[in-house]
Design a protein with these regions (language model features):
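Acidic/His-leaning functional-site neighborhoods
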Residues: 10, 26, 66, 71-83, ...
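Acidic-aromatic substrate-binding/catalytic surfaces of carbohydrate-active enzymes
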Residues: 11-65
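Short Pro-Gly-centered flexible turn/kink motifs
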Residues: 14, 59-67, 268-285
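Asparagine-centered strand-capping/turn motif at beta-strand->loop junctions
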Residues: 14, 124-130, 236
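Extended, loop-rich substrate-binding clefts of extracytoplasmic carbohydrate-active enzymes
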Residues: 68-117
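Beta-strand-rich interaction surfaces with strong enrichment in secreted/lumenal proteins
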Residues: 110-112, 265-270
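Active-site/ligand-binding surface loops and adjacent short beta/alpha elements
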Residues: 133, 143-146, 150-226
């Protein structure tokens, strides 16, 4: 099932499978990647209750071993559309025998999409219906179209950033804590290239900013604000004409992790009957040329 939202010149399309955002238009501009399977057949999958991969493909939850699929199961399941209008739609997911075989908790997970004047607000909400603490990771994976030469694009942060990102080992699927590469040093601007992503994701686990702009040389692009998230992944498929800007709480395992899910870096933990919301926004921007 696909739902279309529209308000003035802003429109969005969301499919019930994974509650995935498939299109976001502001005026005549399509902000999202087209999901061309020649590069990557997705547009904006949900990451819950897992981000990335597990060390040795398994984890310990309450002393028992579990295997959770890469990026979690939410992106692959049908979510139930509910409480929707012409400008807002909410989708929900609760536990099942399938999810409990990977993640032994009762929960309610919702995602709400709400149009705004120049883009979209996305809010994830997680409720723990279990009688014990529930650890989980949560993240977004929106892919933005980057037509033309990738070297014409840059990321701009509102705060000065110094970041050496952990190497992502393509063989193990793990971040390497003691093998980092510097990407930005006391600056607000990061120039982009395809080669930057040949080792997969650039994971900013010590970022000061909670907002980032993706701009081309004409200063046209998008801004992603992510006040409720603790880190940021930036990724593209090899030589692809898109860039994913991914607000995260959690990540793929590091090579020095304990293997206990509740001890994962960036993990969130909800007490019984606890609830927490995570919001990010996508805003279309066209900046005036710098003088």
């Amino acid at each position: 099932m696909e739902i279309t939202l529209k308000s003035g010149e802003v429109s969005a399309k969301i499919t019930s499978k994974g509650a995935e955002l498939k299109s976001l238009k502001v005026g005549n501009r399509e902000l999202m990647w087209s999901a061309d399977p020649a590069f990557w057949g997705k547009t904006s999958p949900l990451l819950f209750p897992m981000i990335g991969t597990l060390k040795d493909g398994k984890t310990l939850i309450n002393g028992s071993e579990y295997k959770i699929t890469k990026h979690g199961f939410a992106r692959d399941l049908e979510l139930t559309p509910e409480d929707f209008s012409s400008t807002s739609a909410m989708f929900s997911l609760t536990q099942s025998d399938y999810t409990k075989a990977m993640f032994p908790f009762d929960f309610r997970f919702t995602v709400r999409y709400t149009l705004k004047a120049d883009g979209l607000t996305v809010t994830y909400r997680v409720h723990n219906n279990s009688n014990s603490d529930m650890p989980f990771c949560i993240g977004a994976h929106p892919a933005f179209a980057t037509p033309g030469d990738m070297t014409d694009y840059r990321l701009e942060f509102p705060k000065l950033e110094t970041a050496a990102v952990p190497n992502y080992n393509l063989s193990t699927g793990l971040h390497e804590e003691n093998n980092r590469r510097p990407l930005i040093d006391g600056d607000t601007v990061l120039l982009l290239s395809h080669e930057m992503f040949y080792q997969d994701v650039c994971y900013f686990d010590k970022l000061r900013s909670r907002s980032v702009q993706l701009l081309n040389k004409e200063n046209v692009g998008v801004r992603v604000d992510f006040p409720d998230f603790t880190s940021l992944g930036v990724w593209q498929a090899k030589d692809a004409p898109f860039l994913c800007i991914e607000p995260w709480c959690g990540s793929a395992d590091f090579d020095d992790c304990s293997g206990v899910f509740a001890e994962k870096r960036g993990v969130e933990i909800l007490p019984p009957d606890g609830e927490k919301a995570f919001t990010y926004t996508i805003t279309a921007i066209e900046l005036k040329a710098k003088v």
